Amino acid sequence: LRASIWIAATFKSKMGLQQSMPLDPQVKKLFSLMAVFPQPDIGKITPQQYREAADKASIQLSGEPEAIGGIEDKTIQGRNGGIRIRIYRPLNQRPPHKVVIYYHGGGFVFGSIETHDNVNRLLANLSGRAVVSVNYRLAPENKFPAAVEDAFDAAKWVVSNGESIGLDSNKVVVAGDSAGGNLATVVNIMASENFIERQVLFYPSTHMLDNSPSIHEYGEGFFLTMDQMRWFGQQYLRDVRDAVNPYASPMLADLSGLSPALVVTAEYDPLRDQGEIYAHRLRASGVKATLTRFGGVIHGFISFYRYIYAGRDAIAMAAGFIKQ
């Protein structure tokens, strides 16, 4: 499979994707804002210290919260205990609301409902759907498959109980960014009951052993680094055997029968190639998949839509796809 990744990436100019653009000036401005935050050294601090620093920076850079129709925090029951969720209801829409279930990014190590509050507010308003944000368990305290179990259990809970809280949840959309994109598509793979209408994957992690060109091209100096990716994998996986489990590396799964997908990638992102190759694997498996690369931007750009306007455009694109 690794060889096929290299081959597919070599021919990406034929995929109909946007050709190379200079780094967006708005990204450069964001980098200058990020410079005021101490950069955690993964070799010298604990995962918990890394999480605290990364979450704090994410929240402070998210900007003023978007007005929303309503917010409700709940703790639901999963197979291994309580799972915290937050329900965002869109402005000017009466219940019952159709549903997007959202899984935040953060390398399976950091991130939370709070770090992605801005994204979920905007997605709810633009899509006209309720967004249910899931606070799944994080590594290394809870290694694979804990996050997967929480992600799936939360989706099942919403489908089974949504009507009681004003949600039209017979069919749901799953969405997520980075590690959350991994969880969204894995939930789709697991959902034999076919309750998933569509999947939205922002720069998803799809292969734990990926060695494609973009990892080396953009693995240093563009926000997400190769060293961080390796470290995240070490925190998340129990051992190397987990790396080839299709629930950790959905690139290795049977993708036939999955729901239509929107895959959004960022040009200056080490995860770019694996996201794009995953979209083509979906198509080769008979799944309708829309692939869009945003030029000139970095991993995580939707979280910084206050500074990088392409982030808002990507969320608006997702909202349009959800409403189709």
Task: Cite the ranges covered by each PLM segment.
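Gly/Ser-rich "nucleophile elbow"/oxyanion-hole loop immediately N-terminal to the catalytic nucleophile
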Residues: 159-173
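Proline/glycine-enriched tight loop/beta-turn segments at coil->beta junctions
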Residues: 81-83, 90-99, 256-258
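A glycine/proline-hinged amphipathic helix-loop "lid/cap" segment
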Residues: 1-87
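Short amphipathic alpha-helix adjacent to the substrate-entry channel of hydrolases
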Residues: 114-134
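Hydrolase active-site cap/lid region
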Residues: 189-241
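Short beta-strand/loop motif that positions the catalytic acidic residue
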Residues: 263-265
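Gly/Ala-rich beta-loop-alpha elbow adjacent to hydrolase catalytic centers
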Residues: 176, 180, 184
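Catalytic active-site module of serine/aspartate enzymes centered on a nucleophile-bearing elbow/loop
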Residues: 306-324
